[in-house]
Amino acid sequence: HAAPGESLQEQIGLLWERGHRQEAVDLLREALNQDPASSELKTTLAEKLLQLDQGDEARSLLHSLPEAERNRQPASGLLARLQFADLAQGAPDLAALEIQVQENPADCAARRQLAARQVLAGDDEAALEQFMAILRRDPQFGDEAGRKGLIALFEMLGNENPLTITYRRRLFSLLH
């Protein structure tokens, strides 16, 4: 268990790294029961739940935050990530989608699902590439899914992220 003086976040980080994910989540829930107003705890718990594919609970935690908190990092990024979890819901797995897109490059629906799966797998750059490809092939597809996907990813990554800077520039030159 915890060494004295170890912060809660450190304990959770260690449990998580060692694969004791449910214990980490339980510890966070316990802490949140002690301090139900803590935005930091809610955000951390939501992040962990998202990684465990428990999007519904993550969503309600994030929506329980004050609006000002919801609209800035890290909560805004997690909410953006939830959009990708929703897109990936019921989609084929990553490998199947990669094959689908390879066999039919014009399949924007498969590309969008692939991008969502890539985001959830932590491959943000590959996802950005898929959204750029959708935008180039069919800018109006799925109510501008290409552009909206890029913007949601920028939101998730934050303005300072080198990927955001690079792809925002590419988006701008594609649109203008």
List the model feature ranges, each with a label.
Residues 13, 62-104:
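Alpha-helical adaptor scaffolds
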